[in-house]
A protein has these predicted regions:
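GIY-YIG nuclease catalytic motif and its immediate N-terminal context
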Residues: 1-50, 54-57, 61-72, 76, ...
Length: 96
């Protein structure tokens, strides 16, 4: 029986400034709504956001390690390379 993987690392792109936001959650749709409603302090001034990437993990530590890696300089470079063909607009910055 295939169970859905509970932990998600996600990347959002701001329609306002093109910047990317990297996060981790167990409920992607709820979290996206929070970012787009302005209830998330880290992204309130940069909304609206579009989901541009997500990965699911079986364990919380694995997801957290991936989130931390994507926020490093080498992780940001790897992410930009992965997403360069699919982003609606070039990323102006990476934050998270």
């Amino acid at each position: 029986m295939n169970m859905p993987l509970p932990y998600c690392v996600y990347v959002l792109q701001s329609a306002k400034d093109g910047g990317l936001y990297i996060g981790f959650t167990t409920d992607l749709m709820r979290r996206l709504k929070e970012h787009n409603s302005g209830t998330s302090a880290a992204t309130a001034c940069r909304q609206p956001f579009e989901l541009v990437f997500c990965e699911y993990y079986r364990s919380k530590p694995d997801a957290q390690r991936r989130e931390v890696y994507l926020k490093t300089s080498s992780g940001r470079r790897a992410l930009k390379l992965m997403l360069q063909e699919s982003l609606p607009r070039p990323p102006s910055s990476l934050s998270g």
